[in-house]
């Protein structure tokens, strides 16, 4: 399970990080066709045919897939900037992801699809509220699965060698899906990066984890709600979802709480006075760690291994927190009470990179200096805070960077 979780997370990182395209698609000037670029694109498609045939894709399927696809999409690579959940502070992301309207819509969907969700829950052990939250965040309950033709999008990215061979392989997987008859070429649509349908699965994820839950002979994550919901749940189950634990718990800490002991069993946190904000008791056991995404003055969470399962779907902390908190709200849980540090200064990308480099120089950080907050940086910040006798909340701030740079 851990190997699969690491592999899924690695694939998400490739899609969620900033563009390092090795070769940019040429954009035609003043709307005129770029004949050289188009010819190169067609040559790329022709060169793909033998590999597609080796995977069992027929000439008829190949030709149908690329019918009308004669040029790269000039807008695709322009969109390979960081995804919104990385660029915005978590509290801004949550405003849209866990809105009052979305909560109401989700509860309505839960009532309408109660029978289907019960069957999926029984089969996979993944709570309906988690499945609905993913469905909401990924495609607004199926309403926004994407309108970009997948074959052209993947061909554009593959021909430009964006992310090396990743999108070439995804393109071949998309052709395999068409060969198997799950969807017609003209209906295979999704995001600019090839994430498809209501689940926003990449083709490789679709081939491994998509489910024909409604029994019509097609794994249809574009038009079948049952297939989409069951595919989300089945994927989470395969990634290692623990049916006995939540993703995490919004909690309050007692005064004088020792943040240096941030990883422990849930029973230990209970003994130390940690309480859920909904008034329910924490489970009797289970590994958990404190997560303070806005620092020690903001909301506090105890997160479990299921939080990492959510992050395997999308590596953003903001995304994972949105899915988890939305699931809680759909189930009737309370809103977060503690205020977010909305007026406090934040580190920009350059500041985060400087912090990463400074912590790496002290052998505290082992990740890339990519300017992104995440578990590795959070852990490194905590180690530095503990070493320096600071409040060990794992939160990267300008003050922390100043403290670090003042101690060469």
Give residue ranges: language-model regions:
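Sec-dependent signal peptide recognition
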Residues: 2-10
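Sec/Tat signal peptide C-region and signal peptidase I cleavage site
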Residues: 17-21
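Short, solvent-exposed loop/turn and secondary-structure capping segments
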Residues: 24, 77, 144-149, 188-189
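Extracytoplasmic and endomembrane cell-envelope/extracellular-matrix remodeling and assembly machinery
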Residues: 31-70, 78-83, 158-194, 198-357, ...
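Export/targeting segments at the very N-terminus of extracytoplasmic proteins
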Residues: 42-61, 101-136, 147, 156-167
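Acidic helix-start/capping segments at beta-turn-to-alpha-helix junctions
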Residues: 60-87, 135-139, 149-152, 250-255, ...
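Signal peptide-directed extracytoplasmic domains
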Residues: 68-113, 119
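Short acidic, glycine/serine/threonine-rich helix-capping segments at coil-helix boundaries
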Residues: 347-352, 357-404
């Amino acid at each position: 399970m851990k190997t699969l979780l690491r592999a899924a997370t690695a694939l998400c990182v490739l899609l969620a990080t900033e563009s390092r395209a090795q070769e940019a698609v040429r954009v035609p000037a003043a709307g005129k066709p770029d004949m050289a670029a188009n010819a190169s694109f067609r040559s790329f498609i022709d060169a793909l045919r033998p590999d597609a045939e080796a995977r069992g894709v027929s000439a008829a399927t190949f030709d149908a897939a690329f019918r009308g696809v004669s040029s790269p999409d000039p807008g695709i690579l322009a969109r390979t900037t960081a995804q919104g959940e990385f660029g915005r502070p978590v509290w801004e992301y949550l405003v849209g992801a866990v809105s009052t309207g979305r909560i109401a819509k989700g509860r309505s969907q839960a009532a309408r699809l109660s029978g289907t969700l019960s069957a999926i829950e029984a089969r996979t052990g993944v709570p309906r509220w988690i499945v609905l939250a993913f469905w909401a965040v990924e495609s607004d309950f199926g309403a926004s699965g994407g309108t970009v033709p997948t074959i052209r999008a993947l061909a554009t990215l593959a021909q430009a060698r964006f992310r090396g061979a990743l999108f070439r392989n995804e393109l071949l997987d998309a052709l395999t899906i068409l060969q198997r008859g799950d969807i017609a070429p003209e209906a295979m649509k999704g995001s600019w990066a090839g994430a498809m349908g209501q689940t926003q699965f990449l083709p490789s994820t679709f081939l491994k984890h998509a489910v024909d839950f409604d029994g019509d002979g097609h794994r249809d994550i574009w038009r079948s709600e049952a297939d989409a919901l069951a595919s989300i749940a089945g994927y989470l189950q395969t990634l290692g979802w623990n049916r006995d634990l939540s993703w995490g718990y919004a909690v309050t800490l007692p005064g004088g709480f020792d943040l240096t002991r941030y990883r422990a069993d849930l029973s230990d946190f209970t003994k130390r006075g940690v309480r859920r904000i909904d008034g329910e008791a924490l489970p009797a056991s289970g590994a958990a760690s404190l997560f303070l995404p806005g620092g020690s003055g903001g909301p506090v969470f105890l997160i479990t291994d299921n939080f990492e399962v959510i992050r395997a779907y999308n590596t953003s902390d903001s995304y994972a927190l949105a899915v988890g908190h939305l699931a809680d709200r759909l189930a009737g849980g309370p809103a977060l009470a503690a205020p977010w540090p909305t007026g406090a200064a934040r580190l920009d990308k350059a500041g985060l990179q400087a912090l990463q480099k400074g912590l790496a120089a002290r052998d505290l950080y082992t990740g890339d200096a990519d300017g992104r907050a995440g578990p590795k940086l959070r852990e490194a910040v905590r180690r530095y805070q503990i070493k320096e006798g600071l409040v060990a909340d794992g939160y990267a701030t300008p003050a922390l960077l100043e403290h670090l740079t003042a101690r060469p």
